[in-house]
Amino acid sequence: MSKRYQRSNTLLPSPVGAPFRLAVVQFTVPGAKNGGSDKGPDGNRVDSIPIANGVIHAGGACDLLKFDSGIGDADACVAAFDTAANQYDALIVRINPGQLSQGTPQGTQAAFDALMNMYIARGKLIWSSPKIQTQMGAKDALVHISKLNCGLEDTYAYYTEEELFVGFKKTCAFQPRVLKQNRGSAGEGIWLCWLWDKNSNTKVERYPATYLGEKVLKDNDYLKLMEMNDNHVEFHTVKEFMIFCVDGPTGQGAGSWKSTFPGEYLKGGKAAHGQLVDQRLLPRIDEGEVRILMAGDTCQMAIHKKPLGGGLSAVGGNSEYTYYRPTDAKYFGLVQKLYADIPKLLPSLELEGEPLPLLWTCDYIPKNPDTWPKGPYDRSCPDAETEYTVGEFNCSCVGISKFQAVCGGEKTLADVPDADYFDACELTDLMGIKAIEMLVKAKEDRAAKMLAEAVGCGCWVGPRGNPLMKVEVTENGCTCAVQ
């Protein structure tokens, strides 16, 4: 149990004179039980009260604030929300992606996102901003981070049919690959790809190219494909697979498919987030993924997700979980390398100036160093020398698993066992600390910018615009006269 705070299943009173006011933003889906599968019978996300209480524990004021879609059209709904939200210094948006398009006036999601972007432009902190969710959560983020510690250099993005056909035929002629669609969150449209000898019904051990670009695959070359949502296996020619990716299973020449998802991964083009990302298949993926759970710039937990039954997918219920502190030796080096990457992470994603998400995850896959003498398939590489590469970022309303267990039914936060409650509150309390830290830094940065501008023009500067000091810029430097 927490040594500092007693359990609270309801929102705590905010401290008097708190330096910052925050709100946890929620939305009730019209007609859905509890207002959505992420909520309890009180209509709140089960993690919303602990997140708000985490802010309160850290010294901030925090309320629960709901977006109401029943006021009128999208503009009217957003205007009413703006009136309520404008009083806060920061918003923690806990609305699942897509919920604002369920039973709402047309254009609600776009109008809400525009309001969040306007707040950000004015200096209000939003976790997570629409831009962060779109660009950090997109699969082509893996291309942008390819030169960081957490990236894989031979990572490519395809936005057109021509890019896909040319690129994949080149990469898969050299080594096994993983193709990842941009849409979906449970492994659908993520394909592991191996060359297969159809005549002998065996895996091809020696690929045609000895280096990338030496040779390319032909349309009739044969592939073994595994989809990560359920580990099912299919065999297709390169041409059939490419047609499925572009036109779906009914595309002319696509062959017969078992996948329950429709392909068409490039549909709508780049503007509609249609894309495929092509990465090297790391053979140690069967050891599972390592999820690094982050609050702002701090790791709260490392979670090893091991596939069950000899599978390769650690998605959802297909895996068993082992939890590690960030200081545990097994993943300490991984966490430290992530910390080293953080200052470069958002700039590499063209997100410089945006705040880090308040709650986000990185899913890592283990690999042997490229210089490992025994090659990528060897399993004798020790923990200290094992490298890790990011397979996915998630920053879109990340759930807190030990609270999620009571979502969607008749149970409430009070039904979460004490051990799970206090474990989960370690994360929500850290989120509160990080939220206040980021607000303090944002305030300091604004003050420094104002001072720099004042120095540049020789203005009077002081708290809240009070003329306490006159800064004069001369050839010999700056002089200050105190009022």
Region locations from a protein language model:
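Conserved N-proximal alpha/beta basic substrate-recognition cap immediately N-terminal to
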Residues: 29-31, 38-173, 185
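Short N-terminal or domain-adjacent regulatory/targeting segments
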Residues: 2-18
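ATP-dependent carboxylate activation and anion-phosphoryl transfer catalytic cores
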Residues: 2-3, 101-102, 284-287, 298, ...
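Short, solvent-exposed loop/turn segments at secondary-structure junctions
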Residues: 29-30, 70, 97-98, 133, ...
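Structural motif
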Residues: 23, 92-94, 178, 277
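A positional/structural detector of protein chain ends, strongest at the extreme C-terminus
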Residues: 479-483
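Phosphate-binding site of ATP-dependent enzymes
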Residues: 188, 194-352, 362-380
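Nucleotide-activated donor-dependent transferases that construct or modify glycoconjugates
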Residues: 16-39
